[in-house]
UniProtKB/Swiss-Prot annotation:
Main location: virion
Keywords: Virion
Organism: Acanthamoeba polyphaga mimivirus
Cell location: Virion
Protein name stated in the entry: Uncharacterized protein L851
Gene Ontology cellular component annotations, sorted alphabetically: virion component
InterPro entries: DUF5754 (IPR043930)
Highest rank taxon of the organism: Viruses
Amino acid sequence: MNSYIREKVDEYRERYDLPDLKVTRSDKEGKRLKAVYTDKDGHRKKIYFGQEGAYTYADGAPDYVRNAYHARASGQYTKKGKQAISIPGSAASLSYNILW
């Protein structure tokens, strides 16, 4: 994990009040990272996120690629109508805030 990702994980912990958030390499095929944390109800969550092998802003992708990703991700909503990137601990939120 590079220093950019470590810095973004620290920011994410603080922003979403997830002090025990740990992000490591994924052990699941096709996924890049794994996040483990305790949610507000006290349940342990394990979320896999990021496409394995994808070239993200964390890897040095240019700003225009980041902007395109942000535009796409901002338009994703859950079945209940909530913006996916605004849900703390979701794969969409983790990818948006840590990898991009």
